[in-house]
Amino acid sequence: MLRSRRNLPCRMRAVDLIRKKRDSAELSREEIDFLISGYTSGEIPDYQMAAWLMAVWIRGLNRSEIASLTESMLCSGELLDLSGLPGKKVDKHSTGGVGDKTSLILAPIVAAGGLIVPMISGRGLGHTGGTLDKLESIPGFNVNLPLEVFRHVLRECGMGLIGQTAEIAPADKKIYALRDATSTVENIGLICASIMSKKLAEGIDALVLDVKTGSGAFMKSEEDSVRLAEVMVETGQRMGKRVVALITDMDQPLGRMAGHSNEVIECIEVLSGRGPADLRELSIELSAWMFFLGDRTKSVEEGRARAETMIVTGQAKEKFKQGIRLQGGDERVVDDSQLLPKARSHADVISSSFGFVTATNCEDFGTALAMLGGGREKKEDSIDHAVGLEFHKRIGDHVEKDEPLVTIHYNSGAKLAEAKGLIAESYEIGEAAPSGKRPLIRRILGG
């Protein structure tokens, strides 16, 4: 547990620790505890924490400091005690992208296969979609459960998906808001501590990380994605957890749909044994690793077979219904997608040339979706769950002139022309198809 301020050396001052990091010196666990506990309690003001964060952004943190920061943030709040629930507890975290919807597929697959999946998720911001926003497109679905109710849901069906509560890693919530306001978000050590402090607070035994790379990812280069993955895997392992990271492609959207209710429909298709091949492949691979790390199978290969069985037998689909029902949602949406929000209008983005799709700027797809009301620029912005993009052409596909590239599903046409222009510019079309097959899963680290 985090030590109280009175047990820390009285000579510590925030200004000294700011100077120390400014000068590239390593901070001890006690010094990091002092900063985090002091800032969380309000004893250290915003301006001093902002100065320290900028020093970290410039000078960086070593692996020991990252582990200490993660543990201090983790222990700033309540640790979810799931020891009373039988079975291993395993979760998945994705760094986010466009059409990134695997949580809604793998949670019921893995829960149906005998593990407990306590998933504390986030909302979309900027060009990336959020799991909570997708779930809230299901009428009545409640993502704001008290922790005791969350435990009950997990006990009943083995899966639960909620938002971060005030009790879970409060230091992270406060520090992230300050990072966002001071341009100190893009730092691997700070990103790792933010993600891992929330995930480890769930009381899990193992964690599977889906670290995206490419034009639609937070980390654009594979090198940066691998560095982040390595740090998160090591941090989790230092704390006694089994952790694996998959580096996966986000140079184009995952699946054929982006937008909240549209993505729910696509998830149901996969749980019904259909759906896009890439979405199905990644969902099964992530589920397989969860089964393996959770000791439900002796190998990842067995895990894939188990995941397939949960889909083919209908057990995963029924588990999804049960999870929706227990969180107050209308489970009928699983069999009748007309009960989900629908956009009033649609418009096609047409190709201006013929050839092959050689690349896409995937981030721009997410930006266009947000522009139409399907995303947020600020956390307090409202969201239109019916807005969506339906992708007809992927990298490597042949395209004729005047052929639809994307269908936009929208309610307000105020920014339609701007969104159409941005989407059209996001496609690169050349005379020849790109050579070689694009791997969906680039690398696997840890495990």
Regions found by a protein language model. Give the residues of each.
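Short glycine/serine/threonine-rich phosphate/pyrophosphate-binding segments
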Residues: 98-107, 111-112, 119-120, 126-129, ...
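Short beta-strand segments
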Residues: 120, 154, 162-165, 195, ...
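Well-ordered secondary-structure scaffolds
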Residues: 16, 21, 26-29, 39, ...
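Phosphate/diphosphate-binding glycine-rich loops and adjacent basic-rich segments that engage nucleotide
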Residues: 155-204
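Active-site cofactor/substrate anionic-group-binding motifs, chiefly glycine-
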Residues: 60-121, 125
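Alpha-helix C-terminal capping segments
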Residues: 58, 104-118, 198-203, 238-239, ...
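A glycine-rich helix N-cap at a beta->alpha junction
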Residues: 134-160, 230-236, 240
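N-terminal glycine-rich anion-binding loops that anchor highly charged ligand groups
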Residues: 11-12, 21-84
